[in-house]
């Protein structure tokens, strides 16, 4: 494999997982804070808020998993390597 392609693949994999985890990480923190604030304001709606929060967190985490899959493809099944 060309060393330039290998270096670029490692750099792209690092950027893919880093950037793919940055957005969902910030969004998960924000969503959790807002959910706790909502539960503090309306304790009787705790179950509904918690269910919605967990579903939202799962969708946000899927974006990070897609970044991980792209990084693994670039590292181990590189389509640009001959």
Swiss-Prot record:
Pfam families to which the protein is assigned, alphabetical: ATP-synt_C
Q: How does it sit in the membrane?
A: Multi-pass membrane protein
Q: Which residues form a coiled coil?
A: none
Give residue numbers for the site Reversibly protonated during proton transport: 61
**What do the Gene Ontology cellular component annotations say?**
plasma membrane-derived thylakoid membrane; proton-transporting ATP synthase complex; proton-transporting two-sector ATPase complex, proton-transporting domain
**Molecular function (Gene Ontology), one example:** proton-transporting ATP synthase activity, rotational mechanism
Keyword annotations of the record: ATP synthesis, CF(0), Hydrogen ion transport, Ion transport, Lipid-binding, Membrane, Thylakoid, Transmembrane, Transmembrane helix, Transport
Q: What residue ranges are annotated as transmembrane? A: 3-23, 57-77
Tell me, in one coarse class, where this protein mainly resides: membrane
Briefly describe activity regulation.
Answer: Inhibited by dicyclohexylcarbodiimide.
| Compartments it resides in | Cellular thylakoid membrane
What this chain does, per the entry, is described as: F(1)F(0) ATP synthase produces ATP from ADP in the presence of a proton or sodium gradient. F-type ATPases consist of two structural domains, F(1) containing the extramembraneous catalytic core and F(0) containing the membrane proton channel, linked together by a central stalk and a peripheral stalk. During catalysis, ATP synthesis in the catalytic domain of F(1) is coupled via a rotary mechanism of the central stalk subunits to proton translocation.
Q: How does it assemble?
A: F-type ATPases have 2 components, F(1) - the catalytic core - and F(0) - the membrane proton channel. F(1) has five subunits: alpha(3), beta(3), gamma(1), delta(1), epsilon(1). F(0) has four main subunits: a(1), b(1), b'(1) and c(10-14). The alpha and beta chains form an alternating ring which encloses part of the gamma chain. F(1) is attached to F(0) by a central stalk formed by the gamma and epsilon chains, while a peripheral stalk is formed by the delta, b and b' chains.
Q: Which NCBIfam families match?
A: ATP_synt_c, PRK07354.1
Its family remark reads: Belongs to the ATPase C chain family.
Q: Can you name this protein?
A: ATP synthase subunit c
Organism the protein comes from: Thermosynechococcus vestitus (strain NIES-2133 / IAM M-273 / BP-1)
Taxonomy-wise, where does this protein's organism fall, top ranks first? Bacteria, Bacillati, Cyanobacteriota, Cyanophyceae, Acaryochloridales
Record gene name: atpE
